[in-house]
Regions:
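A substrate-binding/cap region within the structured catalytic cores of diverse enzymes
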Residues: 1-22, 29-50, 57, 61
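Short, surface-exposed recognition loops or helix-turn segments adjacent to catalytic cores
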Residues: 26-32, 72-77
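Secretory-pathway/luminal and periplasmic proteins that interact with or process carbohydrate-rich
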Residues: 37, 83, 229-233
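Short, charged low-complexity intrinsically disordered segments located at boundaries
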Residues: 47, 175-176, 229-234
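Second-shell residues forming the walls of enzyme active-site clefts
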Residues: 48-216
Length: 234
């Protein structure tokens, strides 16, 4: 295939979603499948080399958004380098910063350049970036790298916090607070309403106690409002 086909496929998907009343597609997957047999990514990846994934991922994001649907590049900073399934366990990827820059991060740079409206985080340890917290809960990954070095101004959404990699260690609601403090705009709890409500309560209490960085919190609210405004104009 070619990049134009990726754009057209994304556009068709976006158009079909709009016909069904949907406006947010948690795609494309821009993980480079550098480890074969990856159970969480597998055939969802565009390929095993960064150049291919970069080309197709950016164009698919453009296509989805050309149809008036928000796209989401995932899973930052890269889920392709492990065969551990984050739905069950917490993996570690031991790439250096230089190796990350040369491989897994390349498609994300391209997606940002393409104007992707959101980026989803991954529940993986990257010791080169943060020895204590996985990507989803790491200020070094979300604020310093994605917001700072990569200059990303769109929405950061987490992967589902009820997945085994996170819930079994932190609890989903507690992780939502940690993710928000680390720089996530939209902590995602996709199964349990009660757990989502508890997460909202924990974040509200943290605000009341002065534990949140309020300029950053307000900036997150502004990014979400901006996305809603963009969608309303489509």
């Amino acid at each position: 295939g070619n990049a134009e086909e990726a754009f057209l496929t994304g556009k068709r998907i976006g158009e079909a979603m709009r016909e069904m009343g949907l406006n947010y597609d948690l795609a494309p997957v821009v993980d480079v499948e550098s480890v074969c047999g990856n159970p969480a990514i597998g055939s969802r990846s565009f390929g095993t080399d960064a150049a291919t994934v970069t080309r197709f991922g950016a164009e698919m994001a453009r296509g989805i958004q050309a149809a008036g649907v928000m796209a989401c590049a995932k899973h930052f900073p890269g889920h392709g380098g492990t065969n551990v399934d984050t739905h069950k366990s917490l993996p570690t990827i031991t790439l250096s910063m230089e190796e990350l820059e040369a491989g897994p991060l390349v498609p994300f740079y391209a997606a940002i350049e393409a104007g992707v409206k959101s980026i989803m985080t991954t529940h993986i340890m990257f010791p080169a970036l943060d020895k204590e917290y996985p990507g989803t809960l790491s200020g070094a990954v979300l604020s310093a790298l994605l917001r700072g070095k990569m200059r990303y101004g769109g929405i950061i959404i987490t992967d589902c916090l009820e997945m085994g990699a996170i819930a079994s260690r932190y609890g989903a609601a507690e992780a939502a607070l940690l993710a928000a403090k680390a720089g996530a705009d939209m902590p995602l709890i996709s199964h349990s309403y009660n757990e989502a409500a508890r997460a909202a309560e924990l974040i509200s209490r943290a605000i009341e106690r002065g534990e949140m960085n309020m300029p950053e919190h307000n900036a997150a609210l502004g990014r979400i409002a901006g996305a809603k405004e963009w969608l309303s104009m489509q």
